[in-house]
C-alpha cells in the first residue's frame, strides 16, 4: 500500500500570537521548528520512505518539509513547491488578532468566516502590505488567479488541480508522498480524499503536529488513516 503523509507546518510566529496568517510569509517559531524535527523523527521511526515531496511557496511549510525530511534522513528526496498548496487566503483578516477580530465583528461572524465551507471573509485591498499581487513569487501567475480572499471551497478548487496532476498520479504509480502544507489546504484535500460533505469538513481540525498518514490501495481508496505516534 502506498502512503501519503500530510505534515502541517509547525507552529508559526503568528500562530503563537493568535493572528490570521493566510498567505503572509511568516516564519516558524522555536516550538514550530522543533515540531518539524519531531515529525521527521516519527516518520523515521515508522519506517516510511518517500519518493516525492511537495510543499507550498510559504517559508513555514518549506522549512517544515526540509526539517522533517532531514530528521528522517531523506533530505535528498525531490521537493516541488506550488502556490496551489498555500494556506487559505484570509483576505482582509490577514494580520489581525483573532480575539480582536471577534470583538470587532462578533464571535459568530468570525466563526462563520473561519469554519464555514463557502462564506468568504472580507477581501484584502490590493495595496495592502500582505497583498500577493505585488509579491514576486506569484509574478508568473495571471493576476486574475491571485486571490484577495478565500473560503475552503475556493481553496479546494485551486488545490485540486495539483492533487490531480501531481499527487494522485504519484500515488497511483506506487510512490510514497510527503506533503508539507497548511491547516486549510490539507483540510481541503482531506475533504476530497474522504468525500466529506460541506458540513462534515467543518469539524475537521489539522494540528501542527503530528503528521497525518493515509494509506491507499491501487485505486486510491483509503485503507487506513492515522496520526503518527498515536
UniProtKB/Swiss-Prot annotation:
Keyword Lipid biosynthesis: no
HAMAP family to which the protein is assigned, alphabetical: PGAM_GpmA
Keyword terms of this UniProt record: Gluconeogenesis, Glycolysis, Isomerase
Organism placement in taxonomy: Bacteria, Bacillati, Bacillota, Bacilli, Lactobacillales
Gene3D superfamilies: Phosphoglycerate mutase-like
GO molecular function: phosphoglycerate mutase activity
Pathway info: Carbohydrate degradation; glycolysis; pyruvate from D-glyceraldehyde 3-phosphate: step 3/5
An example Gene Ontology biological process: glycolytic process
Chemical reaction(s) catalysed: (2R)-2-phosphoglycerate = (2R)-3-phosphoglycerate
Catalytic residue positions: 9, 87
Protein name: 2,3-bisphosphoglycerate-dependent phosphoglycerate mutase
Annotated positions for site Transition state stabilizer: 182
InterPro entries listed in its UniProt record: His_Pase_superF_clade-1, His_PPase_superfam, Phosphogly_mut1
Residues involved in substrate binding: 8-15, 21-22, 60, 87-90, 98, 114-115, 183-184
EC code: 5.4.2.11
Cysteines engaged in disulfide bonds, as pairs: none
Record has Iron as a keyword: no
Protein family per UniProt: Belongs to the phosphoglycerate mutase family. BPG-dependent PGAM subfamily.
Function: Catalyzes the interconversion of 2-phosphoglycerate and 3-phosphoglycerate.
Amino acid at each position: 500500500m502506498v502512503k501519503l503523509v500530510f505534515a502541517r507546518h509547525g507552529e508559526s510566529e503568528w500562530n503563537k500570537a493568535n493572528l490570521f496568517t493566510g498567505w503572509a510569509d511568516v516564519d516558524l517559531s522555536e516550538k514550530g521548528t522543533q515540531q518539524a524535527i519531531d515529525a521527521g523523527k516519527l516518520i523515521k521511526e515508522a519506517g516510511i520512505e518517500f519518493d516525492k515531496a511537495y510543499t507550498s511557496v510559504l517559508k513555514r511549510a518549506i522549512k517544515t518539509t526540509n526539517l522533517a525530511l532531514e530528521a528522517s534522513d531523506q533530505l535528498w528526496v525531490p521537493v516541488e513547491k506550488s502556490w496551489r498548496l498555500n494556506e487559505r487566503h484570509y483576505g482582509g483578516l490577514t494580520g489581525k488578532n483573532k480575539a480582536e477580530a471577534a470583538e470587532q465583528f462578533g464571535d459568530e461572524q468570525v466563526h462563520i468566516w473561519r469554519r464555514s465551507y463557502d462564506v468568504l471573509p472580507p477581501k484584502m485591498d490590493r495595496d495592502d502590505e500582505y497583498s500577493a499581487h505585488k509579491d514576486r513569487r506569484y509574478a508568473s501567475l495571471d493576476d486574475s488567479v491571485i486571490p484577495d480572499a478565500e473560503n475552503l471551497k475556493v481553496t479546494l478548487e485551486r488545490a485540486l488541480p495539483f492533487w490531480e496532476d501531481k499527487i494522485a498520479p504519484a500515488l497511483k504509480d506506487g510512490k510514497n508522498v510527503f506533503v508539507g502544507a497548511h491547516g486549510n489546504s490539507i483540510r481541503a484535500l482531506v475533504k476530497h480524499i474522504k468525500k466529506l460533505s460541506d458540513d462534515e469538513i467543518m469539524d475537521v481540525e489539522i494540528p501542527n503536529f503530528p503528521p497525518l498518514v493515509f494509506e491507499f490501495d491501487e485505486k486510491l481508496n483509503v485503507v487506513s488513516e492515522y496520526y503518527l505516534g498515536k
